Amino acid sequence: MGGEYPLNCSAPGKVLLSYSESDDIKAYFNDPISKMTENTIVDYSHFISEAINIRQSGYAVDDEEFAKGIICIAAPVFNCEGCVVACVGLSTLTLYDSIHSLTNKKLELLKGVADEISKKLGYSAKE
């Protein structure tokens, strides 16, 4: 619990960065980025493609991008103005689960929690 995780290789970080202004995303990738594992995204173009998927699907995954053996899913939390102000994430070890199993078993629950928090913050999704 606690600690700091890079925005480009953690599911919560990827959610927050994906919903940032495009200039902020570019600025983030202008700084040197460490490749934490062979799965870490360090290329701006690759991340933009991932960010589009995150915005469309409403969640992000970290498939051993931050550290070998650790996987995570995260969903955005919106405020009353429709801005992402936080996210809800769930991490586990590959010893216990796979990213596909975690996504299939827990994603809807996770997104439901994020939606409930968003509603409490005054967010109303546009249908």
How should these model regions be labeled?
Residues 31, 40, 44, 69, ...:
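Residue-level detector of alpha-helical recognition elements and their boundaries
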Residues 71-75:
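Short hydrophobic beta-strand micro-motif common in sensory/regulatory domains
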Residues 77-80:
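Sensor-regulatory modules in signal-transduction proteins
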Residues 86-127:
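Juxtadomain coupling helices with adjacent low-complexity linkers
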